[in-house]
Amino acid sequence: MTKPTGFPTRVQAEALLAEAEARNPGPWTAHSRVSALGAAALAARHPDLDEDTAYTAGLLHDIGRRAGVTAMRHVLDGYLYLNELGFPGAARISLTHSFPIQDLACSAGHWDCTAEEMAFTAQALRGLEYDAYDRLIQLIDAVALPAGCCIMEKRMVDVALRHGFNAWTLNK
């Protein structure tokens, strides 16, 4: 297995999340920690995944929430922030984690971005071929609550209660 590039170390990722939590505290940080532990546990048993990379990807997938209380904007904010820091692999996860289907319309929240920002996000998403880390974090994001992992249906109800139910919810 080759360790992917473009991800911070665990120590760096923990520092980034701590700084983000100080800026915008909320249950999203506990969810991120649960996601990190779950992703690392799954990666430890997978022959092609690196446990440390999976941990940092899980820890930072929602890092865009550092900017404040937003809906789908956190995807773009995280992508831009992590790219600016020189972590394109982690930035990619911030972008892909909300889209098991590569279409902005399938998101579980409203878009609080400008039309130009949405177009940029759509283009960036379309240009990717998902890898095992993208899929791993999509999976763990779908089962991680702030208090721990749960069955996927419970998490989907949690998301639907907060963000609503749309035409893509069942397809996901």
Which residues does each predicted region cover?
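Non-catalytic interface/linker regions that flank or bridge core catalytic/transmembrane domains
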Residues: 1-8
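Generic N-terminal amphipathic, Lys/Arg-enriched alpha-helix
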Residues: 10-25
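Divalent metal-dependent catalytic cores for phosphoryl transfer on phosphate-bearing substrates
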Residues: 18-22, 45-159
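Active-site hotspot residues in diverse enzymes, especially metal/ion-binding acidic/histidine motifs
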Residues: 38-42
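Active-site/ligand-binding-proximal alpha/beta "capping" segment
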Residues: 163
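A short, charge-rich alpha-helical start-of-domain segment used by transcription regulators
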Residues: 27-29
